């Protein structure tokens, strides 16, 4: 993985990165760095009320941010059975999670990825990163490094040199408490 160390260093320094996911490039940052989160929202021109997804290499990386005690054992098992994979779950959030991550919600969107390059980033960084599509609001999501450079090249985003997966649709989003599908994947 060509520039993994550069990308992890960028995260540690509070910078925004772009990286390939299952279907499109994402942009993200350290979910515990308020300035990095503000920079990400600025790059995306994204309202802070919308919140962000956390993407991780394992459920263990998500535990500091999510409150599984508010879910039943069956609900937790359903979540675990879908991971790693392209299902994002809305789950109860711990109060220590920064409001810029959750937006206007009292829950948080989380996913354990199966994408090897994102897993490598999260493992090397030691925790999850935020995830939202790598595009300016209103434009199509980027599926290549070239497209990321065209849309976000002048924003200072550090781009991970990798390939997106084979998905043509965004990841499915499901509510852990109700089981309802909020977005088809």
UniProtKB/Swiss-Prot annotation:
One of its GO terms (cellular component) is cytoplasm. Its EC number is 2.7.7.87. Keywords: ATP-binding, Cytoplasm, Nucleotide-binding, Nucleotidyltransferase, Transferase, tRNA processing. It is an enzyme of class 2 (transferase). GO terms for biological process: regulation of translational fidelity; tRNA threonylcarbamoyladenosine modification. Residues 1-185 form the YrdC-like domain. It is found in: Cytoplasm. GO terms for molecular function: ATP binding; double-stranded RNA binding; L-threonylcarbamoyladenylate synthase; tRNA binding. Transmembrane segments: none annotated. It catalyses: L-threonine + hydrogencarbonate + ATP = L-threonylcarbamoyladenylate + diphosphate + H2O. Belongs to the SUA5 family. TsaC subfamily. This is Threonylcarbamoyl-AMP synthase. It comes from Aliivibrio fischeri (strain ATCC 700601 / ES114) (Vibrio fischeri). The lineage of its organism: Bacteria, Pseudomonadati, Pseudomonadota, Gammaproteobacteria, Vibrionales. The gene is tsaC.
């Amino acid at each position: 993985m060509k520039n993994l160390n550069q990308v992890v260093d960028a995260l540690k320094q509070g910078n925004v990165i772009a990286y390939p996911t299952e279907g499109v490039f994402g942009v993200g940052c350290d979910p515990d760095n308020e300035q990095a989160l503000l920079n990400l929202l600025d790059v995306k021109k994204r309202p802070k009320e919308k919140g962000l997804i956390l993407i991780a290499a394992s459920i263990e990386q998500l535990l500091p941010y999510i409150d599984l005690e508010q879910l039943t054992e069956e609900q937790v098992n359903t979540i675990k059975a879908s991971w790693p994979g392209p299902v994002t779950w809305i789950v109860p959030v711990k109060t220590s999670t920064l409001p810029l991550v959750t937006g206007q919600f009292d829950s948080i969107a989380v996913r354990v990825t199966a994408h090897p390059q994102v897993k490598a980033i999260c493992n090397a960084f030691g925790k999850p990163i935020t995830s939202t599509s790598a595009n300016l609001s209103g434009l199509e999501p980027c599926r290549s490094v070239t497209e990321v450079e065209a849309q976000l090249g002048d924003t200072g985003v550090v781009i991970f040199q990798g390939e997106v997966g084979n998905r043509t649709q965004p990841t499915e989003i499901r509510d852990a408490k109700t089981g309802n599908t909020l977005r088809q994947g």
